[in-house]
């Protein structure tokens, strides 16, 4: 597939301010002190944001312990070691949700990964961090997921939330009540890697 890139200045109805900002003209610099160009911007931010070694070591130790308990892979521990040695971070997060929550949670995590890769390529060692907001108390907000059926109709799958309304959602352990929800999700997803993962057979 052939792609062609056009500068915004050649796209009709693009505002002059927007074009000037992307070109980072001297006039614009008066109002926007940081360049919109990622390599320059990330280098400026890396110089501006500094953490003391004690805090960095505490965060690194905590991440190492948590990820060991999660069964994380070697790349995660290599990134934690990079953080310990001074790497910057691209941080994002989301409240926990049934089966990982909405798709944009995954997009947020992937964005942190891509930003960290781009920063590293620009000369600023950077690792991605995605945190789960487990302290949220609104189970009714995260106890469900919508999947699309074979005929294209969204179907809402939910777990019961009675009896645990006041608990942080990260402390709630699901029992057999999740089984029918998992089975329905598997039926909607068909024979896919995600379905096998939900069943625990992948």
Predicted regions and their residues:
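N-terminal targeting/trafficking signals and adjacent low-complexity tails
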Residues: 1-202
């Amino acid at each position: 597939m052939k792609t062609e890139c056009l500068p915004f200045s050649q796209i009709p109805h693009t505002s002059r301010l927007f074009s000037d900002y992307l070109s980072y003209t001297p006039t614009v610099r008066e109002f926007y002190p940081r360049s919109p160009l990622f390599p320059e911007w990330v280098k400026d931010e890396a110089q501006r944001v500094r953490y003391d070694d004690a805090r960095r070591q505490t965060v690194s130790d905590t991440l190492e312990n948590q990820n060991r308990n999660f069964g994380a892979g070697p790349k995660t521990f290599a990134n934690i070691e990079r953080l310990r040695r001074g790497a910057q971070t691209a941080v994002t997060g989301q409240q926990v949700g049934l089966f990982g929550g909405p798709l944009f949670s995954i997009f947020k995590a992937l964005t942190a990964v891509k930003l960290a890769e781009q920063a590293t390529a620009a000369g600023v060692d950077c690792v991605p961090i995605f945190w789960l907001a487990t302290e949220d108390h609104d189970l009714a907000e995260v106890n469900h997921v919508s999947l699309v059926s074979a005929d294209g109709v969204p179907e809402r799958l939910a777990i019961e939330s009675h009896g645990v309304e006041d608990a942080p959602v990260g402390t709630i352990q699901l029992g057999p009540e999740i089984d029918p929800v998992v089975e329905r999700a598997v039926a909607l997803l068909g024979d896919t890697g995600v379905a096998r993962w939900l069943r625990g057979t992948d």
